[in-house]
Regions:
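Short alpha-helical segments that sit at the start of domains
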Residues: 2-31
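Short acidic, hydrophobic short linear motifs in intrinsically disordered regions
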Residues: 39-51
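Short, hydrophobic-biased segments on the C-terminal half of alpha helices
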Residues: 63-67
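Glycine-centered, phosphate/nucleic-acid-interacting loop/turn motifs that mediate DNA/RNA or nucleotide
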Residues: 73
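Short, Lys/Arg-rich nucleic-acid/phosphate-binding segment
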Residues: 79-85
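Short, amphipathic alpha-helical interaction segments positioned at domain boundaries
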Residues: 93-115
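Mid-protein regulatory/catalytic core that forms ligand/cofactor-binding pockets
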Residues: 122-206
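C-terminal regulatory/effector modules of DNA-binding transcriptional regulators
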Residues: 176-266
Length: 266
């Protein structure tokens, strides 16, 4: 099947293209995180071009983004004969692995062991700010954090209290899930709902394009809010419906073999 003559593919790419300004380097991070995160996984320059250019991104922009990612320590590049190959550095693999559970988790978190940390205004703020860098904490206000898991034992300058039940007020829900995030999630949900089942003969590169677009859009939603159970979600939050649509489509687009990405379709 000619990659340039597939109406379903072209329409779906247009549907999934991020309505916000796309950062090409971020698209490439999503691509490697999905298709080539494992140690030793490599993608050729021609395969990258074949996957990314259908999104309306020019080869020159891909080269600039790769240069930035090399400079930032995410990606290494090498020559294989006349071809270029690209792969994640150890730093890049670690960064990708750190967010993989969030991106590919099929349900929201369901922790049951909550605690509150309260810092003295001023002197304890630095310690609280450090705690809030951990993924299992959210800020309630300037001096209070809510966390799940065991209560830390090395925070002598803060008050700690276990919480047996939680009632989440609307103002905190709105702070954790602000309106622009809710709107971005709703837009993704609406786009996914309009996509019909994939045809049976997509090329490996076309599959890579679609998976990258889906993961990139979902990543931009799911990594912008804490991983919290439904009691924290606003009434208009569509994240869980969106999550089901994301994985319903990804399941119909199995990961392509990396070697197959170098073979153009007939």
């Amino acid at each position: 099947m000619n990659e340039q003559q597939n109406p379903w593919f072209d329409a779906t790419v247009q549907q999934l293209n991020d309505p916000q300004n796309q950062r090409v380097w971020s698209v490439i991070v999503s691509l490697f995180g999905d298709l080539a995160q494992e140690k030793g996984a490599r993608i050729s320059g021609s395969a990258l071009t074949r996957i990314i250019t259908p999104m309306g991104i020019k080869p020159e922009a891909i080269r600039v983004a790769l240069h930035r990612l090399r400079k930032d320590g995410w990606i290494e590049s090498a020559r294989a004969g006349r071809a270029s190959i690209h792969y994640l550095t150890e730093y890049g693999r670690n960064q990708s692995a750190a967010v993989t559970p969030r991106i590919y988790g099929r349900s929201a978190a369901a922790p049951g062991d909550w605690h509150v940390l309260i810092a003295e205004d001023g002197t304890g703020q630095t310690t609280l700010d450090e705690v809030l860098l951990l993924p299992n904490y959210v800020a309630v206000n300037r001096t209070t954090a809510l966390g799940h898991g065991p209560v830390p034992h090395n925070l002598d300058d803060m008050m700690a209290a276990k919480v047996s039940s939680i009632a989440v007020p609307g103002w905190l829900k709105a702070r954790l899930f602000p309106l622009p995030l809710c709107e971005a999630c709703k837009e993704l949900q609406q786009d996914l709902k309009q996509i019909t089942p994939p045809p049976s003969r997509l090329s490996p590169a076309q599959t890579g394009t679609l998976r990258t677009l889906i993961v990139h859009r979902w990543r931009r939603v799911v990594l912008r809010h804490p991983d919290l159970p439904p009691c924290f979600h606003p009434a208009d939050w569509t994240g869980e419906t969106c999550r089901a649509l994301v994985f319903g489509l990804l399941d119909q687009l199995p990961l392509p073999e990396l070697a197959a990405l170098d073979t153009p379709s007939d």
